[in-house]
Regions:
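Active-site residues of response regulator receiver
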Residues: 61-63
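Residue-level signal for the "D+5" position in two-component response regulator receiver
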Residues: 38, 67-68
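Conserved acidic segment of CheY-like receiver
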Residues: 7-27, 59
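The feature encodes the CheY-like receiver
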Residues: 65-67, 96
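Acidic, metal-coordinating helix/loop segments flanking the phosphotransfer/catalytic sites
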Residues: 38-58
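CheY-like receiver
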Residues: 125-149
């Protein structure tokens, strides 16, 4: 994936309408070309991933969603041979060290705590996309798992 030469296909799984809108607006202001698809619960996410022929370049995954939460989705992604290589960035308001460590151990690429300010959101999304590209989709060590500004 090259941030300047292709449309980056991003999938956002988040049940909060406002967060989805802010995410979309932040992407529109970044100097990169993206295509955003959103789903609002874990069941919808897994159905989409299992039926699509072309996976997104990256999944931003909220933890607290109805019907199937982000932890359950991440586990399901990691046990699926067709999905386990999908880069997953946890994108959540909740933050506790045990959960963060568990998410890293279960295959997530990065963890972003949802920022409260729009400018921070823009910057952290850009940082996440740039970092994942720079590292060629390789999962980071635990000390680099949490992305912040």
């Amino acid at each position: 994936m090259n941030l300047t030469s292709i449309d980056i296909n991003i999938l956002l799984a988040d049940d909060d309408e406002d967060d989805c809108l802010f995410f979309k607006e932040a992407l529109e202001e970044l100097p990169i070309s993206t295509k955003l698809t959103t789903v609002t619960d874990g069941n919808q996410l897994m159905q989409l991933l299992h039926k699509t022929e072309i996976l997104p370049h990256v999944l931003f995954l909220d933890l607290n969603m109805p019907r199937k939460n982000g932890f359950e989705c991440l586990s399901e992604i990691q046990i699926s041979p067709s999905l386990r290589e999908l880069p997953v960035i946890i994108f959540s308001t909740s933050f506790d060290k045990d959960s963060v460590n568990q998410l890293h151990d279960h295959g997530a690429h990065y963890y972003i705590r949802k920022p409260g300010e729009f400018a921070e959101l823009k910057n952290v999304i850009h940082k996440a996309l740039s970092t994942i590209e720079k590292n060629n989709f390789v999962k980071p060590t635990k000390d680099k798992f949490v992305l912040s500004l």
